[in-house]
């Protein structure tokens, strides 16, 4: 068999030079195109998907979903990394998270300054009076409620507080009685006054009856006299008539 004929050396060299030139030109074009479209290669959408460059889309490749956002231990960008460092530097305060964007923390009282602590220490501390068992408190005189709560309790009297009974009473004025001295007593007549009044009433009744009887007697007497006078006048007229009649008969 005959060996295949090899191309001449100048042709091979020219092909190699042309291929290297095309390769170098293709690399320069890819670098410039990738520099212009750099935001698309590294952008992430709001839902956590990575968007490929236009060169990849033009070549027919589809948008490939990327897995969930990287964990806090591996930040995806410089901004996220800065926030994570800030959260790490903050003091850990116990709290609870209501939402992804809201964090509720407990209120912590700020520490006192040295000046405030010195001012508080300069103030004299009040000494507690009385022993531990409170004997002196028991021996203290209790406040009189008549001076505060029951100041206007008694209407017509004076308020009195009885300590051993722990009760409030009223010392009423004359002619007043009751719990609050609000009732007034009326004066009652003695037996002598009542008997005198009875005697006076009897005398008045007797006098009135006597007056009435005398008036009746006087009236009856006057009526009788009038009747008698009238009767006597009629009798005299009858006598005169009889006398006249007798004289007439005698003449006839």
UniProtKB/Swiss-Prot annotation:
Signal sequence range: 1-19
Domain of life: Eukaryota
Disulfide links within the chain: 146-159, 154-170, 172-181
Start and end residues of each EGF-like domain: 142-182
Transmembrane domains' residue ranges: 199-221
Protein's name according to its UniProt entry: Amphiregulin
Family statement drawn from the similarity comment of this UniProt entry: Belongs to the amphiregulin family.
Residues linked to a glycan: 30, 113, 119
Membrane topology note: Single-pass membrane protein
Induction entry: By phorbol 12-myristate 13-acetate (PMA).
Compositional bias per record (Low complexity), positions renumbered to this chain: 54-77
Propeptide: 20-100, 188-252
Keyword Transmembrane helix found: yes
Gene Ontology cellular component terms for the protein in this record: cell surface; clathrin-coated endocytic vesicle membrane; endoplasmic reticulum membrane; endoplasmic reticulum-Golgi intermediate compartment membrane; ER to Golgi transport vesicle membrane; extracellular region; extracellular space; nucleus
Assembly, per entry: The immature precursor interacts with CNIH.
Comp. bias regions, Basic and acidic residues: 38-47
Note: AR is a protein containing cysteines in disulfide linkage(s) that are essential for its biological activity. AR may contain oligosaccharides and/or lipid moieties that are not obligatory for the biological activity.
Basic residues bias spans: 124-143
UniProt-listed GO biological process terms: cell-cell signaling; dichotomous subdivision of terminal units involved in mammary gland duct morphogenesis; epidermal growth factor receptor signaling pathway; epithelial cell proliferation involved in mammary gland duct elongation; ERBB2-EGFR signaling pathway; G protein-coupled receptor signaling pathway; glial cell proliferation; mammary gland alveolus development
Native source organism of the sequence: Homo sapiens (Human)
């Amino acid at each position: 068999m005959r060996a295949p004929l090899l191309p001449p050396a100048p042709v091979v060299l020219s092909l190699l030079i042309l291929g290297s030139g095309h390769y170098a030109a293709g690399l320069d074009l890819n670098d410039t195109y990738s520099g212009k479209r750099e935001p698309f290669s590294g952008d992430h959408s709001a839902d956590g998907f990575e968007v490929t460059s236009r060169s990849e889309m033009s070549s027919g490749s589809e948008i490939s979903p990327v897995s969930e956002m990287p964990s806090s231990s591996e930040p995806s960008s410089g901004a996220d990394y800065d926030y994570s460092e800030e959260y790490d530097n903050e003091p850990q305060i116990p709290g609870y998270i209501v939402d992804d964007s809201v964090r509720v923390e407990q209120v912590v009282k700020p520490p006192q300054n040295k000046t405030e602590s010195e001012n508080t220490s300069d103030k004299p501390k009040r000494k507690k009076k009385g022993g531990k068992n409170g004997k002196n408190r028991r021996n203290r005189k209790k406040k009189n409620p008549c001076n505060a709560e029951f100041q206007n309790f008694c209407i017509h009297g004076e308020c009195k507080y009885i300590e051993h009974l722990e009760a409030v009473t009223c010392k009423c004025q004359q002619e007043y009685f009751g719990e609050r001295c609000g009732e007034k007593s009326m004066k009652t007549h003695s037996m002598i006054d009542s008997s005198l009044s009875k005697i006076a009433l009897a005398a008045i009744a007797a006098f009135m009856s006597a007056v009435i009887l005398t008036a009746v007697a006087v009236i009856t007497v006057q009526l009788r006299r009038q009747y008698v006078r009238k009767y006597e006048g009629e009798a005299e007229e009858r006598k005169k008539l009889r006398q006249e009649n007798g004289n007439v008969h005698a003449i006839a």
